[in-house]
Each structure stands twice: as structure tokens, then as C-alpha cells.
């Protein structure tokens, strides 16, 4: 037995119990509880516990820098292109910039004390610096930094500010639109005016057509609040019903209904003052924002300018749909990320919710051309059944994967074989028609610092921007049961099934008893996904080993598995001991490539003997053909347990379930 095992090349992996325990530190949101020296350690200690965080509870202390990078440094040049943007400031006859006013003086309670009383002639430089120069007010984070990190240093953003230009019409004449706010235009006024046309005319008259033509894109920055960040906070969160909205929150002159409330994009009513605001948007090389629009809004709108669409739902719609990529993607509600959560997005200056958006999901990075193909493993569903399963280590998307590392995996489907479902009746229906699966890793680091969790993100994606064009597979599809806000009458409002925060616990985690899932099977599309283990390197970069297997074939490789008897370490009668087994892949890979030469094994363990218990930290293991790995089983003995016990470990090949092995670990109390 020993001699035969020596012919098998050994491999050290994090699947061992001790390395896995060290990997618990991979979760920045939590750590192993403190113990007194006399405390008996628990048998169950998950290697990758899910401890998701509510964005409402986050602060700037949650930000973690990406090791070895300095994307916010203006001296770091992008490797491909710097996009030159004009930042054009606009105000109105009835509204000047909020940050020029005394702290807390506006109807909305802005500006915050951090920025107030700024003279009008200093506003262009103030906002140019706030958005794109690292400083105290923006906590050292910029739009340029976002795109440098998101693209791995490929593209950057440079801004030049102009203005302030006084618009010829009042603020609400631009903000009230028939599509979102029907019937909300004050009597005698004309609404739905084209602020871009008026802004471009004013800017061109000042700077000249030659100057305005030098830029790749234009950010129009208008004074005041935006509707997206105020409709809920200054609507149903503040007033019990539309009849309760007082005149101070109503129009300056009556609207046709005589109400102080007005319709808004997602719900039937909000206060008129909230509804009369501009909703940020992008078209034809320019985007429109306001003072309450955080840095993430600019990153979101620039994505549109670069040629990619929205991927979000109406969380209050009829029929109701689950969020698409939600909190995990810039083109979904990841735009809302930032300390304090979505209900702080009304604040000016915008340093809370909406100030640091999530990275783009892998599908969107591929479309934007901001991830290197050499760092993406391309697989095909039909090819997998002939090649056998693929095993790969994927680096967290916020960190550079290096020359040979992977930023993610894309599996081409050819066609989506999922059974049809009805989005009109089923909120969890993805609508079908997907072209791919993607697998990537999220860590709460860099621009993903204000996502709620670290783990593996699995998504179905489409090649065309036909929303939903990316759909996250939710490890917890059930209602997350999260409080949204307290209504004015004191009752609690939970988030809807369509709210993006339903996906806060969507990530997959490695190991047993994590609180999440470590595998996902799409029977219709004949694919099985595994999360095998995790590792955080010395610098702090997180990665996961994942595998994808076809349900229709295991490839030409000869499969095999063998186990050596276990070796116990520690005293099970005084606490938690470990039985370590040597698991060998005795198969042959043949001519399979580096990522196709492994197998995945499903493990089970049982203890015999009165008072003895066993627990597997990881019920999956992987090894390349011709190599072996250690598998740890945690064991403990209660007081009064039999003097002798036994743990039996069973390993079964996922590629060929006929290939199994068993081994025993002999135990005794001391």
C-alpha cells in the first residue's frame, strides 16, 4: 500500500482541514469567534461561512484596498485609452447648486455639513475634483479609479469642468416628463423640455464648437436632487398617503389634479417635489446627472455611452420580477452600492449610497472589451461531454488575475434548454433564451467593498442586450425577509421579491454548512457546477477552485480513486481532532489539457462507537490524475464515549460513480 502510493505524485491543496480552517479568514465580514483556552472547540467549523452584510449597516470602514494596486493614483496611465470627458454644470432660474447653500437649508435637508456655502464660480473645480481627484471628501475614490480597477488598468477617465450655465427654464420644466410623471406639470407651464439642447447651446456659446468637439463624452451635472434618489425617501417613506403630502412638498402652482403628490417611475405616487426632478439617463454620447448622483451613477451612465444597456427590473412592478444581477452588477442595482445603503442616496454631496458601485459582471466586461481573453476560460456545453469536466481556479474580479490567472469562466450553451416559464406569473422566471453561463468570484474589496458577501457568482447570460441579459443564479431563491424601512405610521415595510437586495445571499460558498450552497445543477441544460475550495493568498487576494461538468458525458479519461487509512491528529476526548486521509486520483488523463485532467470526488464520512461524532468540512475534493490530496475529517468524543472509535471515509468519482474507495481511521480516547 505505501509503496504503491509513492508512485502517485503528491499535491498540497487547501482542501486539507488545516488549510481550510486558515481560509476562514477569506470572509472579511466575519471571523472565528474568540475562545477562552478552556473552551471546547465545536465540531462544525465551516471553511467558508456565509456572513452577508446589509448595505444599510456599512460605513467607509468597510472599504478594503486591492493589494498591489493604486488605481486612484492619477499618475498611473491606462494601457489602452483615457476617455476624455466634459463635465458641464447647469443650474436654473428657480434653483442654484445645493452645495452653494448653507448646510441643511434645502427642503430635502441638504447640503450635508461636509460641503456647503461654495461660491458659484468655484463649483466647476469643486465638482471636477470631487468626482475625479482623490481627496478627503470623496474618501480618495474617483471615476477614473473605478474604470481603471474594473478594466484591470486598460481604460481611464479624465474630466474637464465647464459652467455654471443658467438654463432658460425652471428646474421642474426639465424634470417633469409625461412618461414618468403624467399630469404633474403645473398649470400654465410647459414641461418635458430638452435640457441637453439648452445645455449644449449654452456650453457651445461659451467654449466654442471646436472646444466642445474635443471630448469623447459629456457629463451634464444639474443642480439639486435627482428623482431616482428621492422618490421613495420623500414619498412613501415620509408620507402615509398621497393625501398627506403637505403644500410645501407640492408644486409652486397647482397641477391639474390639485394634489401635492405626483406619479413617479415605479409607483403611483410620491411628493411632487421628488417627482419633479431629473432622472439620470444617457443617450448619444452624453449623460445627465444631478448633485445627488453618486460616482457610481456616472460609472453606470458611462457604461451606456460605451454601448451597453440597462439590466434591471421594476422592484414594484406588476407583474413582479426578481432582480436580474441586482447588487452584483454595475448595470443593475450595483449602482446603488456605497456606505449606508440605498436610502442614503438623497444626500448631497453624494458620499454614501451610490458613491461606490459594484464592478461589471463578467458578461458585461466581455462586451465592453475590458477583460483579457487570456484570463477567461472558454468552455462549451456540448464539448464538455466529450472532454470531461473542467477544474479551474478563479481570482476575485476586483484583483488583477495576472498573466496566467483567470478572471472567470464562460460556458457557451448554443441554446437554452430550460423549460418555458411565465414572467407574468412567476417572479423567479428568468424568461429563457440565454446563450451562456458565466462563473466569477466576488470579494468585498476595491469597488466591490460595498457588495454584501464574498463567494462565487454564477449567472446565465445573453449575447445581446435584451434584458434580462444577465441573470444571477441565487443560492437562496427564497425571500430574504429583509426590512426596507419604517412607514410613517410605524409599521415595518419589508423589501419586495423584486428588490435587488433579495440577491444579497446569492453567492455560492465552499464547504459544508456554510449557510449557502456549494453546487448547482441545471438539469435542463445538462450542467453541474461545483465550488470546491477557496484560498486567500498572503497579499489578501481571494480565489476559488470551481468545476463544471456535463451531465451527458465524462470524457475519454480513465477514472479512478484510492484512499489510504486515516491518520489522527489531536485529542478527540479533549476537543476537536482530525483524521487526515490521502485521496489519490488513480485515473489517467491521457491528452486532456491542464484544466481537463482532474476529477471531482464526492465525500461522506461516518463515525462508529458510542459518543463519537464526525464531520466533513468539505464534501467535495479534486485531484489531477496521478496526484493525491489530503482530506480532513473532524472528529470528537463526548465524555464517557467508548474508548475506541472509528471513522469511515468514502470517496466517489463524480465523472464515474462506479469508481469508489473507502478507508478507515482508528480512534481512541486518551
PLM regions and their residue ranges:
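A domain-level signal for the mature, folded cores of soluble proteins
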Residues: 288-289, 309-422
Amino acid at each position: 500500500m505505501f509503496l504503491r502510493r509513492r508512485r502517485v505524485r503528491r499535491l498540497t491543496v487547501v482542501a486539507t482541514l488545516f488549510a481550510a480552517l486558515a481560509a476562514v479568514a477569506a470572509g472579511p465580514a466575519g471571523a472565528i469567534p474568540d475562545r477562552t483556552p478552556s473552551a471546547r472547540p465545536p465540531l462544525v467549523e465551516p471553511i467558508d461561512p456565509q456572513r452577508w452584510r446589509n448595505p444599510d449597516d456599512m460605513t467607509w470602514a468597510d472599504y478594503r484596498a486591492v493589494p498591489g494596486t493604486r488605481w486612484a493614483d492619477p499618475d498611473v496611465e491606462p494601457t489602452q485609452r483615457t476617455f476624455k470627458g466634459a463635465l458641464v454644470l447647469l443650474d436654473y432660474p428657480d434653483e442654484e447648486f445645493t452645495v452653494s447653500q448653507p448646510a441643511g437649508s434645502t427642503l430635502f435637508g441638504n447640503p450635508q455639513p461636509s460641503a456647503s456655502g461654495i461660491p458659484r464660480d468655484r463649483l466647476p473645480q469643486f465638482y471636477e475634483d470631487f468626482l475625479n481627484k482623490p481627496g478627503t471628501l470623496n474618501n480618495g475614490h474617483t471615476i477614473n479609479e473605478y474604470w481603471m480597477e474594473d478594466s484591470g488598468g486598460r481604460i481611464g477617465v479624465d474630466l474637464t469642468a465647464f459652467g455654471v450655465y443658467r438654463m432658460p427654464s425652471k428646474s421642474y420644466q426639465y424634470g417633469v416628463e409625461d412618461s414618468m410623471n403624467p399630469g404633474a406639470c403645473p398649470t400654465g407651464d410647459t414641461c418635458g423640455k430638452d435640457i441637453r439642447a439648452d445645455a449644449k447651446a449654452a456650453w457651445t456659446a461659451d467654449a466654442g464648437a471646436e472646444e466642445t468637439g474635443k471630448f469623447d463624452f459629456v457629463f451634464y451635472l444639474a443642480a439639486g436632487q435627482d428623482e431616482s434618489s428621492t422618490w421613495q425617501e420623500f414619498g412613501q417613506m415620509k408620507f402615509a398617503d398621497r393625501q398627506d403630502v403637505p403644500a410645501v412638498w407640492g408644486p409652486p402652482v397647482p397641477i391639474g389634479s390639485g394634489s401635492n403628490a405626483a406619479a413617479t417611475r415605479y409607483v403611483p405616487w410620491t411628493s411632487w417635489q421628488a417627482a419633479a426632478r431629473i432622472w439620470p439617463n444617457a443617450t448619444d454620447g452624453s449623460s445627465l446627472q444631478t448633485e445627488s448622483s453618486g460616482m457610481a451613477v456616472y460609472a453606470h451612465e458611462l457604461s451606456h455611452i460605451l454601448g451597453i444597456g440597462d439590466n434591471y427590473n421594476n422592484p414594484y412592478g406588476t407583474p413582479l420580477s426578481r432582480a436580474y444581477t441586482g447588487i452584483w452588477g454595475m448595470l443593475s442595482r450595483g449602482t446603488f452600492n456605497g456606505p449606508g445603503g440605498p436610502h442614503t442616496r438623497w444626500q448631497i454631496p453624494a458620499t454614501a449610497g451610490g458613491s461606490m458601485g459594484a464592478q461589471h459582471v463578467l458578461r458585461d466586461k466581455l462586451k465592453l472589451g475590458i477583460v483579457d481573453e487570456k484570463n477567461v476560460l472558454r468552455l462549451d456545453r456540448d464539448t464538455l461531454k466529450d472532454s470531461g469536466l473542467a477544474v479551474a481556479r478563479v481570482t476575485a474580479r476586483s484583483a488583477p488575475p495576472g498573466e496566467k490567472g483567470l478572471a472567470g469562466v464562460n460556458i457557451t450553451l448554443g441554446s437554452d434548454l430550460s423549460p418555458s416559464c411565465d414572467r407574468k406569473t412567476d417572479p423567479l422566471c428568468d424568461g429563457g433564451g440565454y446563450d451562456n453561463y458565466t462563473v466569477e468570484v466576488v470579494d468585498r474589496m476595491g469597488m466591490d467593498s460595498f457588495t454584501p458577501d464574498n463567494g462565487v457568482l454564477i449567472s446565465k447570460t445573453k449575447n445581446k442586450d435584451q434584458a434580462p441579459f444577465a441573470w444571477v443564479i441565487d443560492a437562496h431563491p427564497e425571500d430574504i425577509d429583509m426590512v426596507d424601512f419604517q412607514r410613517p405610521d410605524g409599521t415595518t415595510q419589508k423589501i419586495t421579491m423584486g428588490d435587488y437586495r433579495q440577491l444579497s445571499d446569492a453567492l455560492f460558498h465552499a464547504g459544508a454548512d456554510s449557510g449557502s450552497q456549494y453546487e448547482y445543477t441545471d438539469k435542463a441544460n445538462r450542467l453541474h457546477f461545483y465550488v470546491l475550495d477557496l484560498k486567500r493568498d498572503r497579499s489578501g487576494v481571494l480565489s476559488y477552485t470551481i468545476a463544471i461538468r456535463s451531465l451527458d458525458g465524462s470524457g475519454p479519461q480513465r477514472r479512478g480513486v484510492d484512499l489510504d487509512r486515516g491518520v489522527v491528529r489531536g485529542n478527540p476526548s479533549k476537543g476537536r481532532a482530525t483524521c487526515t486521509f490521502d485521496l489519490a486520483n488513480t485515473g489517467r488523463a491521457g491528452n486532456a489539457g491542464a484544466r481537463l485532467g482532474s476529477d471531482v470526488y464526492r465525500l461522506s464520512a461516518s463515525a462508529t462507537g458510542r459518543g463519537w461524532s464526525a464531520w466533513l468540512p468539505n464534501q467535495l475534493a479534486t485531484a489531477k490524475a496521478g496526484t493525491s490530496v489530503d482530506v480532513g475529517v473532524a472528529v470528537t468524543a463526548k465524555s464517557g464515549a467508548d474508548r475506541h472509535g472509528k471513522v469511515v471515509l468514502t470517496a466517489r468519482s463524480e465523472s464515474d460513480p462506479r469508481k469508489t474507495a473507502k478507508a478507515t481511521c482508528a480512534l481512541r480516547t486518551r
